[in-house]
From Swiss-Prot:
This is 5'-nucleotidase SurE. The keyword tRNA processing does not apply. Gene3D superfamilies: Survival protein SurE-like phosphatase/nucleotidase. A divalent metal cation binds at residues 8-9, 40, 93. Its main location: cytoplasm. Signal peptide: none annotated. Transmembrane segments: none annotated. SUPFAM superfamilies: SurE-like. Its EC number is 3.1.3.5.
């Protein structure tokens, strides 16, 4: 099995090393093509106005000055060049990618690009942050991902579908099983944090507040709250079918 590994945290991210170890447990035919720098939050952006710079780190490890989407395209169309991977693995992201995170996530987008290219694809993220901790329990993903990936691939990933996997913020032995979930919803409050530099000139950061709300039943948010591994199938087709039907009746 040939595996293409990418991420959005960058080629030097600890989560990428974790995913390389996970991939190595599944296959000895693993290629890594990851962004040269952190691309968190770039979603499915594609570099059209800047050239892509490719740096070979080792025989099967490459860095691209571009987005996760660029990396998957470069990996499939240039580096592998006709030797198509059997699966694209994207991650392991430092932090969960659930609910609205999915829209912003470069990790999920890397997997989505694999699906667009007709390749089974799985996004993997490790939640963290409870009790003020600033480091992830990478051991959770390390322990549970290989077997879970094998089960997902054996079950099959349909065309135009991405599997979004999130590991809970707990040690491996505290995981309360696997939950197959729907994408959840949280109450996001998007703010602009205004600051001043040393010369008194203003600059700004996008900031998010997440007020507490009860997670929806059967969602990825609920699964993580109960220390379960969340497995969410996502489709590339984002058509709102009920509204399509209603509009067809009302507007035509």
């Amino acid at each position: 099995m040939r595996i293409l590994v990418t991420n959005d945290d960058g080629v030097h991210a600890p989560g990428l090393r974790v995913l390389e170890e996970i991939a190595a447990a599944l296959s000895d035919d693993v290629y890594v093509v990851a962004p040269e720098s952190d691309q968190s939050g770039v979603a499915h952006s594609l570099s059209l106005n800047d050239p892509l710079r490719l740096r070979r780190i080792s025989e099967r490890r490459y860095a691209v000055k571009g987005t996760p989407t660029d990396c998957v395209i470069m990996g499939v169309r240039r580096i592998l060049d006709g030797r198509e991977p059997d699966v694209v693995l994207s991650g392991v992201n430092s932090g969960q990618n659930v609910a609205e995170d999915v829209i912003y996530s470069g990790t999920v987008a890397g997997a989505m690009e694999g699906a667009i290219l007709g390749i089974p694809a799985i996004a993997l993220s490790q939640a963290y942050g409870r009790a003020g901790r600033e480091k992830a329990f990478w051991s959770c993903a390390q322990a549970h991902a290989p077997g879970l990936i094998e089960k997902i691939l054996a079950t099959g990933v349909p065309a135009n579908t991405v599997v979004n996997v999130n590991f809970p913020d707990c040690p491996p032995d505290a995981v309360e099983g696997v939950a197959v979930t729907a994408q959840g919803r949280r109450g996001y409050l998007v703010n602009v944090d205004a600051r001043s530099d040393g010369r008194g000139n203003p600059y700004y950061w996008i900031a998010f507040d997440r007020p507490f709300s009860e997670p929806g039943k059967g969602t990825d948010v609920e699964a993580l709250a109960h220390n379960r591994i969340s497995v969410t199938p996502l489709r590339l087709d984002i058509t709102d079918t009920p509204t399509l039907t209603r509009y067809a009746q009302a507007l035509l």
